[in-house]
Each structure stands twice: as C-alpha cells, then as structure tokens.
Amino acid sequence: MDNEKRMTTWCRMWNEDPSLAHDLMTDDCTQWSDHGAGLDTVVGPHEQERFVAGYRARHVNIFSPRVLADAGDRFAYLWDVRKADGQVLTGIDVNHLKDGRVRENWTFVAERRCERSDPEPGAAGHTDPATIEDLCRQWVQLRNGRAELAKDVVTGDFDLFSGAEAAGDAHGPSELADLIERQAETNDPPVITIHRQPIVDPGRRHVAFLWTAETGADGASVGGVDLLTVRSGRFARAWSLTGIRPFRY
C-alpha cells in the first residue's frame, strides 16, 4: 500500500469500515487531535476500530482526501469533511510510518472550508529537496516577524488559507507581508518552531510540517501544521491550521 492509498483508506476507515484500522495502524499507533483529548487514549487498531464504530453511530461525516505530501515513511494530506447538516470543513492529517503502517498520527480540523481549487496532480515537476527545506526555514522566519522575506519566499500569485478565519488569509507577497506585520504588532506574538521533521515531497513539490507556537509571557504552547506547494523556487500555496493544545509527542 502506497501513501496515496493509505490516505484514501484512512478516510474510508472513518466513512464506512472501522475494521480497516487493522490494515493501517501498528499495534502501538498513537493519535493526537488539535481540538481535544478524545483520541489520546485510543492506541492501536483494536481500540481504533471500537472508537470509530462508536463515532459513526453518533456522527454521519464523510471524509475526502485532497492534497498529498509524500516523503515515504512520512506523509501528510489536506482533506475535507462533510457533516450531516451539509457543513464542510477542511483539515490536515500528518502520519509517521513504521514497517509500512501508521505509528503516529496528528489531526487538525479548520473552522471552515478552503474553497480554492487544488493544484493539478503531476503538473508541478520536481524540486531539489534542499531547496524546499531552505524555503521552510525562511517561511518560519517570515512567520516570526520577518515580513520583508515575503517577496523572496512566495510567488506573485501566492495564496494562504488560514484555518481559523478569512482575516488570516493572504493573496500575494504584499498582503502576506502586511499580515505578518499586523501579527507582529500584537501583544506577545508567539514564536513558531518546526516540530519533528518536515515532510518533503520533491516530485509533487509539496511540503508539510508540524510546528509549535509558544508565547513568551507564560510559555504556553499550541501545535499547528502548514502544508505548502512550491513553484519556481517559491511557495505558491499554503494551508495553515492552528490547534488549541500542545503536542503530546
């Protein structure tokens, strides 16, 4: 099973067949959700099957995968979920594998749906992994207040989707720089650092990484995730989702 199949099967597990957990997860697979601790105690496929069966008895939600970043033993993807009342939300999952099965999972759900169309599969070509990793470092510097980097880090038609609200979106380097400057002017803006290792997909020119945002006043932190696409050596699209709790691992 490749990672494209894994993301589709993971959605099917939640949509229709909880027993698929046994094909997807290691016996000690752990999960983390950005909005609550409900998955913290769900370890391995047996507990996952029971949990999902109970979840499906209470919720009629349909998950659909959208954009994949595939690094072999790690992958992340953008997805949508349609609720019973017709509301659609966008989310991102990050997965680390062990022996071909998911060992660690992180799940983020936005407050709204990203309505922009997804990049065309296979249209991007190939970018050197070191270039993508360097862009990630510059992106973090940008998010930490270096607004002047926007013109060098993103394309002229860059588009940022914020999972929280439309006020956090940005289109093009000028809007992005203005957004960063406004955020830097707030009281005690958080400092963002990459958590674990970026998921670099040079073939698709996609990258995703977990990050931690920590405030200086009380040291409180929350986990977040960014998924980005690369074109002509710069970021062209970005989806950024922020949780309300710190990472457990």
Enumerate the language-model features and the residues they cover.
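C-terminal and inter-domain tail/linker signature
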Residues: M1-Y249
